[in-house]
Amino acid sequence: MISFFFKLFQKFINYTDIPLLMATIVFVGRSNVGKSTLIYRLTGKRVRRGKRPGVTRKIIEIEWKNHKIIDMPGFGFMAGLPKEVQERIKDEIVHFIEDNASKIDVAVLVVDGKAAPEIIERWEKRGEIPIDVEFYQFLRELNIPTVVAVNKLDKIKNVQRVVHFLAEKFEVPWDEIDKTFIPISAKFGDNVEKLKNRIYEIIRERRGQRE
């Protein structure tokens, strides 16, 4: 009975109304998937961004409500940059996350919900592990709680189909899909509050495990 009421309480609680001690939240994703726009929607603070892929090329830290937001450079294709430079940036992202894994409370992997299925299938046809899939697995191997923000909700015709496709490729159990994938529109703000609540929920779970 107690468990039932606790779950009911969790369903209606707004985690953003409850203060938290400083948490570190890392945003990662391919270039030009909307990370900086999403961070602006969440925090009200602008990060340098643009239409050319790869505008954010340095690690950017933002203080927000006593928390630390880390905007990682986009990985993958970056306009005007040689392949070796792109690989070096990816390596820097990997090393930073590996070195700071114990300090990271939650990672938000932002994917382009409209383009991701086609990109993933293209990589698989080449016999390669899609970079979005590889990065999700990398975060999980480091035991960093990860939520996937499926961006550009406003451009997706069948959201459920895309989410289930990603869940299969990311090897996420069916009973964890709703907690792992949050379809959003960073451009229009759709479901951003839901994502924020999920981030806070993960932080609380993380803090409980550390106590």
From Swiss-Prot:
Residues 21-205 form the EngB-type G domain. GO terms for biological process: cell division. Its cofactor is Mg(2+). One of its GO terms (molecular function) is metal ion binding. The keyword Cell division applies. Gene3D superfamilies: P-loop containing nucleotide triphosphate hydrolases. InterPro entries: G_ENGB_dom, GTP-bd, GTP-bd_ribosome_bio_YsxC, P-loop_NTPase, Small_GTP-bd. It holds the Pfam family MMR_HSR1. GTP binds at residues 29-36, 54-58, 71-74, 151-154, 184-186. Mg(2+) binds at residues 36, 56. Keywords: Cell cycle, Cell division, GTP-binding, Magnesium, Metal-binding, Nucleotide-binding, Septation. Necessary for normal cell division and for the maintenance of normal septation. Belongs to the TRAFAC class TrmE-Era-EngA-EngB-Septin-like GTPase superfamily. EngB GTPase family. This is Probable GTP-binding protein EngB. It comes from Pyrococcus abyssi (strain GE5 / Orsay).
